[in-house]
Curated annotation (Swiss-Prot):
Record protein name field: Potassium-transporting ATPase subunit beta
Residue numbers on the Extracellular membrane side: 58-291
Organism (species): Oryctolagus cuniculus (Rabbit)
UniProt entry tagged with the keyword Transmembrane: yes
Swiss-Prot/TrEMBL keywords: Cell adhesion, Cell membrane, Disulfide bond, Glycoprotein, Hydrogen ion transport, Ion transport, Membrane, Potassium, Potassium transport, Signal-anchor, Transmembrane, Transmembrane helix, Transport
Length: 291
């Protein structure tokens, strides 16, 4: 019993560990002979090669079921969101205030518009084609170069007086500002049955305000998005796609008064009454022009 409880010295423990690492009597290293180390190494190499192959095969089969031309993630909204340029956000949404006589208050707004429209220059649209059809541009095959689909041109000059080409101030200098409305992209979305969607901007009724109806000039005419820009087939299928735009030039905004402007998309398949998403099918912003 006393022998079992005998404590080993440090040198004895080191000698046992050295003997475990290499036993000259049996030729074992770490408890195994060289041949057994070779066999166990080959076993693990073969095991992990097979496991890696099975994993790669599973990934390959999975990738064959995924359409590379369909986005991995899509919103649950059935109608596209609507965005505005210039976009200046305040504490409670879009708020645009400026003074006609002080160009420092609206220079940044026009700069935002010019920067945004730079992507709609003829040079930026060189890979797109001219479209004149008044119907949807369906493309079942990949007829464009590099296995892609064609995209229709939309250039800034289509916005005419709101293009920044004839009036670099976009109407802000004279108190008749231009605002650009854009619908967000939804893959294979068709906004209407046969008539093109159009933009309609109005003053939003506010208590204690008696406003005359808002007068608007729309560009392109009637504020419509041509149907040949739809459907959108995704970024990989249409890498050069440009969203169509509508510019609204507000003609009779009262000065020194904050008004709320509502611009909504009128189309068969676009809704704008979702209480949970203020930008679905419409955009609302506050505007105050000082003089």
């Amino acid at each position: 019993m006393a022998a079992l409880q005998e404590k080993k010295s440090c040198s004895q423990r080191m000698e046992e560990f050295r003997h475990y690492c290499w036993n000259p009597d049996t030729g074992q290293m770490l408890g195994r002979t060289l041949s057994r180390w070779v066999w166990i190494s080959l076993y693990y190499v073969a095991f992990y090669v097979v496991m890696t192959g099975l994993f790669a095969l599973c990934i390959y089969v999975l990738m064959q079921t995924i359409d590379p031309y369909t986005p991995d993630y899509q919103d649950q909204l059935k109608s596209p969101g609507v965005t505005l340029r210039p976009d200046v956000y305040g504490e409670k949404g879009l708020e645009i205030h400026y003074n006609i006589s002080d160009n420092r208050t609206w220079t940044s707004l026009t700069h935002t518009l010019r920067s945004f429209l730079a992507g709609y220059s003829p040079a930026a649209q060189v890979d797109n084609i001219n479209c004149t059809s008044k119907t949807y541009f369906f493309q079942e095959s990949f007829g464009a170069p590099n296995h892609t689909k064609f995209s229709c041109k939309f250039t800034a000059d289509m916005l005419e007086n709101c293009s920044g080409l004839t009036d670099p101030s976009f109407g802000f200098k004279e108190g008749k500002p231009c605002f650009i409305i854009k619908m967000n992209r939804i893959v294979r979305f068709l906004p209407s049955n046969s008539t093109p969607p159009r933009v309609d901007c109005t003053f939003l009724d506010m208590p204690h305000q008696a406003l005359t109806p808002l007068q608007v000039e729309y560009y392109p005419p009637n504020g419509t998005f041509s149907l040949h820009y739809f459907p959108y087939y995704g970024k990989k299928a249409q890498p050069h796609y440009s969203n169509p735009l509508v510019a609204a030039k507000l003609l009779n905004v009262p000065t020194n008064t904050e008004v709320v402007v509502l611009c909504k998309i009128l189309a068969d398949h676009v809704t704008f009454d979702n209480p949970h998403d203020p930008y679905e099918g419409k955009v609302e912003f506050k505007l105050k022009i000082q003089k």
